[in-house]
Amino acid sequence: MTDIIRAAEAIAQLRREIERHTHLYYVEAKPELSDFEFDQLLDQLITLERQFPQLLTPDSPSQRVGGAITREFPAVQHREPMLSLSNSYSITEVEEFYNRVRKLLALEGVVEQEMVAELKFDGVAISLIYQDGILVRGATRGDGRQGDDITANLKTVATIPLRLEETLVAALQGEERAIEVRGEVFMRKEDFERLNESRPDEDRFANPRNATAGSLKLQDSGEVARRSMSFVAYYLKGLKDESTPHIHRLELLARLGFFTGDHYRLCNTLEEINTYIAEWAEKRWQLPYETDGVVLKLNDVPFREKLGATAKSPRWAIAYKYPAQQARSVLQNVLFQVGRLGTITPVAELEPVLLAGSTVSRSTLHNFDEIERLGLMLRDRVIIEKSGEVIPKVVRTLFEERPADAMPILPPTHCPSCGAPLVRPENEVSYSCPNEEECPAQIKGRLLHFASRNAMDIQTLGDALVEQLVAKGLVKDPGDLYFLQEPQLEKLERMGPKSAQNILRALEKSREKSYERLLYALGIRHVGRATARELSQACPSIDLLREASEEQLATIPDIGPVVARSIIDYFAKPSWPHLLEKLRTAALQLSASEPKEQVNRNFEGVTVLFTGSLERYDRQKASELVLERGGRVVGSVSKKTGMVVAGQDPGSKLQKANKLGVRVVSEDEFEAML
């Protein structure tokens, strides 16, 4: 047997195993391998495919990792129009739809009317084409007639199979040997939160749907892969037997390896439909993803064809959207807050009201344009709303209830922190304070960001302490922190010798934080944690980074022209040389550490959690050992946790890990992996 034949057999076996474990992990939530073990299988496959490039195929699981750059997304025609559904916002409208369909079916002599109720995912609709079971095209809905070809990006979504089971496909597909699957790409709550945590405050997404829509149109499929999106399938076309009922098509999709949402139900009466809608009005909050309603579809596919569609939507389906949770309140005041980058954000102070299980007394108004759009005045009665995981917001002014003593809200003219005249750049919706170097609120914001957990992690440097340090003129930039003296700290409110010593120890410890973390801590506009990592690898010292041209920066992965310009502007500030001098004198890490040859990458891509006390390492050192070897350390257990290291007296996290089937290792086993 030749080497290439042996390699082909090994590759085929690895692909089957990887796809099986991918399905177990992402679709069935029943993982059999840790992230580390799964990555080892994938590494074996990638190694073999590199040795035998002639055996690499587009449907290989190795192609999920992304990396291709797509300069444009060509338009493609849909085989059948991808129509949007009619929306209903009341049970009455659902009943009208049900009765309308029943009358139309009665004209065809049909008495029984089966409807399939499915949860409505708040995602982005896409179409997938499989030729002989292999994914050959993935496209957005677009205008319904044609969409954008985003195949490379969709291949990175773990719950989209790249190859369908051959025997089953052969038995199901029609003469064209092409199956079309439609559904929604979405982002689970946990993945959405993780993505936002890695981004600067000003670049965070408002909700999972916005994050999904933006991610699918990125040109770098490697970045798309890092954003961990999911797919739910609800449409199957191209079958040998096109009379197959919809409920059976959902079952076939599951057999083909797709996630179908699991919670669909066949309903025979209007009462059963109303029960389903009422049941999931509350239960949906417990799901790991956002749903915003229920979709009802006629189960009988041939009769769907007879009912047809309007220009915009099918007559055989409807989407019922749950109303957002709302409450009435009174706008008592509007405060204008200053962010660390100078942006002025209006905040509504509301009469406290209970909404979605918590008391709400404040809500962001985003910018002054929003105040004008809502027509808000002080003392107005307003409707506030909470939908999904989104922060409560003011959605409507009750003009008919406006009191006689209502007062207009005047746009800000001067910074509420430093008094500097505000500016509103052309094409910008927000006012901003240009007094970057002297504005106390901006200085405080930059210091708190510098000390935050994902930056320099100076836990003793809290809001109240920073407020005092800035007010007394002891600190004007992060560099000043490292020159504080114990007597200076002891003079502050609620500060004794012990507290002062703790602060100085925390500052001393932060000097060891990596160059990558320092870059993030500096608070450069648009530079989040992921971008800081790319910068630290491409420019392994602060001197190399500040000497790089805008064109050079724009070629770094994850760095476009906007981010590149922001970096150039940051280092061009008059205050930068002084800050750099302080950071050098304080002996912070201004360059990446030389890679240690003996350090392996055994934890590459593995998410590790520590619980209990370790004998040989403190928690910080153990975490650094994982990070040095390519892993990631988290503070809570989930299905995506790759490994839990259990020390002495582990807490409830160990129980949760066992319940979820997460791999648990002892300190000895952990040390053996290093």
Curated annotation (Swiss-Prot):
Gene3D superfamilies documented for this protein: 5' to 3' exonuclease, C-terminal subdomain, 6.20.10.30, BRCT domain, DNA ligase/mRNA capping enzyme, Helix hairpin bin, Nucleic acid-binding proteins
Cofactor dependency: Mg(2+); Mn(2+)
EC number: 6.5.1.2
Catalytic residue positions: 120 (n6-amp-lysine intermediate)
Keywords annotated in UniProt: DNA damage, DNA repair, DNA replication, Ligase, Magnesium, Manganese, Metal-binding, NAD, Zinc
Residue positions binding Zn(2+): 415, 418, 433, 439
GO cellular component: cytosol
CDD domains named among the record's database cross-references: BRCT_DNA_ligase_like, LIGANc
Keyword Signal assigned: no
BRCT domain ranges (all copies): 598-674
Family according to the record: Belongs to the NAD-dependent DNA ligase family. LigA subfamily.
HAMAP family, alphabetized: DNA_ligase_A
Function field: DNA ligase that catalyzes the formation of phosphodiester linkages between 5'-phosphoryl and 3'-hydroxyl groups in double-stranded DNA using NAD as a coenzyme and as the energy source for the reaction. It is essential for DNA replication and repair of damaged DNA.
Entry-linked PANTHER family: CHROMOSOME TRANSMISSION FIDELITY FACTOR 18, DNA LIGASE
The protein, known as: DNA ligase
Lineage: Bacteria, Pseudomonadati, Chlorobiota, Chlorobiia, Chlorobiales
